[in-house]
Amino acid sequence: MLNMSSDQEPPCSPTGTASSMSHVSDSDSDSPLSPAGSEGRGSHRPPGISKRDGEEPMDERFPACIRDAVSQVLKGYDWSLVPMPVRGSGGLKAKPHVKRPMNAFMVWAQAARRKLADQYPHLHNAELSKTLGKLWRLLSENEKRPFVEEAERLRVQHKKDHPDYKYQPRRRKSVKAGQSDSDSGAELGHHPGSQMYKSDSGMGSMGENHLHSEHAGQNHGPPTPPTTPKTDLHHGGKQELKHEGRRMMDNGRQNIDFSNVDINELSSEVISNIEAFDVHEFDQYLPLNGHGAIPADHGQNTTAAPYGPSYPHAAGATPAPVWSHKSSSTSSSSSIESGQQRPHIKTEQLSPSHYNDQSQGSPTHSDYNTYSAQACATTVSSATVPTAFPSSQCDYTDLPSSNYYNPYSGYPSSLYQYPYFHSSRRPYATPILNSLSIPPSHSPTSNWDQPVYTTLTRP
């Protein structure tokens, strides 16, 4: 907005700069300045032109006498002096840019701006542009006629001078448009990408390496709700993903994407519909063992989605890096963490196999590194579990008899309603949940072993 008066007026009121130049820059094609501005700047240089009618007294409210003066100026003005600004930023290039012919408003604005800038150098160009636009809309057809005629003459002259002229939009503007396009493209590309991650392995079990990486620095994997920056840019995509995740839940509940589902929604939405499931249908998807120290690996969101292929990686004793990048740490780690904070919400925080491991508290399995499927009553080592897991060797159908789904007679035998989360059982749950976030290694520490033997034996 540093235009013709940049050398003589202090920018006093920067308000409205962007919008006020819109009238002018619409028909301008070269520089960010209006032709009125750039020519105005150049017009101070040729002697005898700049202060041509500056002696007339004018009111700041632009009365009708100004319009008459401007039209008089236009009638006697030599337009051949105008086209090239003498000292413009990019005015004198090797190949000068051909501007579009001015329309009637530009003719009016250029002459009036020059006149007013000479008269009132303190007027900010933005305010000037705004007022010129308002005045132009108030002009009658009769008052506009001289400007329209001048614009028509300029158009004909322009056509003569540049017979093969083609309008090319300002390069700066096109870069801006491309930039915003690429921005939105990146945003759109980013969200489907993370959606692909989440739907691809959204219900896959959570590797403890992801839990560690989240606690350590949250540096890889798709963005999770705890780490996603709460910006407007991601907000729309996140809402969209939330609806998409909900749509997936409604669609036969293929995979519940916990990263985009608020835990409060989950408690009402998922739990209210959870009775519709056959709990035995879930059993083939339950992980047999995760990594020893963090049974939160068993906190997989166990839905009926066939994610068997991703479990063998998760079930190994060592975290598989391929799986860790592919699986969604967002899906269950957030629900695990919220499980640690709010143990009373009866969602899929910790899976049955984990509670079976601890509620039976069977000391016969001395190898706590493997957690190898005590539900199957077999000491399969963690090396063989990946091959054994997707198959139906480990069938939990006999578990209700061994108090697997219903360890306490007072509670309904539903997959997700564990007494550990009720207030009467809170003392049993809190040592587990507190210990989940503590041990970072693959071998249990003493502060975890003790609660298993002392507080979690079966009543």
Swiss-Prot record:
Spans annotated as Transactivation domain (TAM): 222-297
One GO term of the biological process aspect: neural crest formation
Biased composition (Low complexity): 19-34, 324-338
Effects seen without this gene: Impaired neural crest cell migration and delay in neural crest formation leading to severe defects in multiple lineages of the neural crest.
Primary localization: nucleus
Protein keywords: Developmental protein, DNA-binding, Nucleus, Transcription, Transcription regulation
A GO term from the CC aspect: nucleus
Motif 9aaTAD location, chain numbering: 413-421
Subcellular localization(s) per the UniProt record: Nucleus
Region called Transactivation domain (TAC), residue ranges: 342-459
Domain of life: Eukaryota
Regions of compositional bias (Basic and acidic residues) in chain numbering: 152-167, 231-247
Region (Dimerization (DIM)): 56-96
Recorded domain comment: The transactivation domains TAM and TAC (for transactivation domain in the middle and at the C-terminus, respectively) are required to contact transcriptional coactivators and basal transcriptional machinery components and thereby induce gene transactivation.
Name of the featured protein: Transcription factor Sox-8
Source organism: Xenopus laevis
